[in-house]
Amino acid sequence: MNEHSDDVYVRARLRNQFGYMTWVPEYVEDRISSKKGILQRYEDYQQKQAKAQEVKTDSLVKYEGAKDVPRNLLRIYRGEADTSALARYEEVVSQKPQWHAPWKLTRVINGHTGWVRCVCVDPVDNAWFATGSNDSTIRVWDLATGKLKVTLQGHIMTVRDICISARHPYMFSASQDKLVKCWDLERNTVVRDFHGTLSGVHSVDLHPSLDLIVSAGRDSVVRVWDIRSRSCVLTLAGHRGPINKVRCLPVDPQIVSCSTDATVKLWDLVAGKPMKTLTHHKRNVRDLAFNPTEFSFASACTDDIRSWKLVDGQLLTNFNSEALGIVNTLACNQDGVLFAGGDTGELSFFDYKTGHKFQKLETTAMPGSLESEKGVLASTFDRTGLRLLTCERDKSIKIWKHIDGATQDSHPGLPWNPSLVRQRF
């Protein structure tokens, strides 16, 4: 390699490695100077002196440079240091959480004889809701009055999940008896049974645009069923533990599932395999909640709630969820409020965008119940987002609403202490 080609190589390497920098490291300058002749180095020195004399200053004493100041401090002063952490902190501080009105208990509904495990609100008229329980029954309640409308019997074990169709008069239920049942809400009878699951079914959901339902449970497999033919059209295997929750979307990823193997999987329904596996959680992931106003969702495990961007599964926010204990349920409304309920009976309300917990309540066990039976097992907001329904171990359903007339001055909420922890992977 001749001298000319060597010089071209050095210049190209300097441009690629240091072209974006406003200063060049001293060791690089020394190597460059060592290759220059005496006359060229003298000319460079004269040019630097001429530029220094052209700098105008109002100071009375000529600045001769810092002598005893460490080099890293000089770089910070000159703005040459890596300020990524500082920039991130300033970004966190600038994103102040939105104020939300506090919530209070307004109604307690009793009727089940076992733990209430699931709840779903009428997606059409927002006039009634259904609950499933350990007593193997499904009960339909009037949302305005809290009165029982009908009791559906057909399962022989715990009813773990319910979903209601917005296009057809059907309701689907999943149970520990290995069955998924389709209920005709006009006749209040079972019209279809979906057989084939090898163990208890923990979750069921209806596809928003296709005549398909998706179920998952203890056998660690997600199954896709054709409603009309009652046949299993697709089996999605990949989880290494029982699946706690499965949810459907009208676009990719059309299926999202979470499991006791501490993972969340985003499934490609056409390819029949996971698009993405989220492994950020360290423990059993118990529930998922989609944001109704943006394309993202939240997931929860013990002492850890995170939100994710779809489609790529990018981590958005680490919620301020320390010391929450086991989180059993999540729910999100249109106002950006994320609710979390767990085994300890604590009800936590978060600002979805910033992850700030603005209110903390504690549910009260019903008279005659044990203190350990005040845990929250399931929850959902109604279609307006103004009422929260919680299902609890004390066999009750509780309805929560905003405090009337609350303002930011009268109810400021819990203090906001921003940190970089919520953005950490």
UniProtKB/Swiss-Prot annotation:
Disulfide bonds: none annotated. Gene3D superfamilies: YVTN repeat-like/Quinoprotein amine dehydrogenase (2.130.10.10). It holds the Pfam family WD40. CDD domains: WD40. InterPro entries: G-protein_beta_WD-40_rep, Prp46/PLRG1-like, WD40/YVTN_repeat-like_dom_sf, WD40_repeat_CS, WD40_repeat_dom_sf, WD40_rpt. GO terms for cellular component: catalytic step 2 spliceosome; cytoplasm; post-mRNA release spliceosomal complex; Prp19 complex. It is found in: Cytoplasm; Nucleus. One of its GO terms (biological process) is mRNA cis splicing, via spliceosome. Keywords: Cytoplasm, mRNA processing, mRNA splicing, Nucleus, Repeat, Spliceosome, WD repeat. WD repeats lie at residues 111-151, 154-193, 196-235, 238-279, 281-320, 322-360, 371-410. Its main location: cytoplasm. Involved in pre-mRNA splicing and required for cell cycle progression at G2/M. Belongs to the WD repeat PRL1/PRL2 family. Associated with the spliceosome. This is Pre-mRNA-splicing factor PRP46. It comes from Eremothecium gossypii (strain ATCC 10895 / CBS 109.51 / FGSC 9923 / NRRL Y-1056) (Yeast). The lineage of its organism: Eukaryota, Fungi, Dikarya, Ascomycota, Saccharomycotina.
